[in-house]
């Protein structure tokens, strides 16, 4: 077992996050490590885990990082970022009430997760909840996903960000590479540092890492 990034460990084809919490979030394997735990990070349940296993180089997240997570769903990836950014805050925005109920339950067991039941299109409604944002992570399957990202980035001005580009949500007719190129060209005020095709874990989705 080797630590490959801050609080992220790898053992052959599996990766884990170092956690102070031994409660399972989605049925993942947990290994005891002295006074802490290692939670297995499933690449088929988390696009960030898939990207790391595909060689993503910018996953050394600071433990004090404050993250605005757009499209948090039930909190699978949020929970692992909570392990990593143990001294930071995760502002997790989710619109679906059913998903939010599980996300809220997760936040009750982790004091660095702040769930927000809101539409990420309507940043004016939740911007006052977010005290500080160093990083945006967005995973939203909507046609206007880049517009959502640009609106939030203009308000919060994080130094760096991850955008999951969901090709089929934008168009199911145009060639994938054409959509990817056009989508990336629509991102404002950021320099693209890394693009990861998430195959075979996730078909038709790309992780884009960028910095100001």
From Swiss-Prot:
Involved in pre-rRNA and tRNA processing. Utilizes the methyl donor S-adenosyl-L-methionine to catalyze the site-specific 2'-hydroxyl methylation of ribose moieties in rRNA and tRNA. Site specificity is provided by a guide RNA that base pairs with the substrate. Methylation occurs at a characteristic distance from the sequence involved in base pairing with the guide RNA. Belongs to the methyltransferase superfamily. Fibrillarin family. It comes from the Archaea. It comes from Picrophilus torridus (strain ATCC 700027 / DSM 9790 / JCM 10055 / NBRC 100828 / KAW 2/3). GO terms for molecular function: histone H2AQ104 methyltransferase activity; RNA binding; rRNA methyltransferase activity. This is Fibrillarin-like rRNA/tRNA 2'-O-methyltransferase. It holds the Pfam family Fibrillarin. Keywords: Methyltransferase, RNA-binding, rRNA processing, Transferase, tRNA processing. Interacts with nop5. Component of box C/D small ribonucleoprotein (sRNP) particles that contain rpl7ae, FlpA and nop5, plus a guide RNA. S-adenosyl-L-methionine binds at residues 76-77, 94-95, 119-120, 139-142. Its EC number is 2.1.1.-. One of its GO terms (biological process) is box C/D sno(s)RNA 3'-end processing.
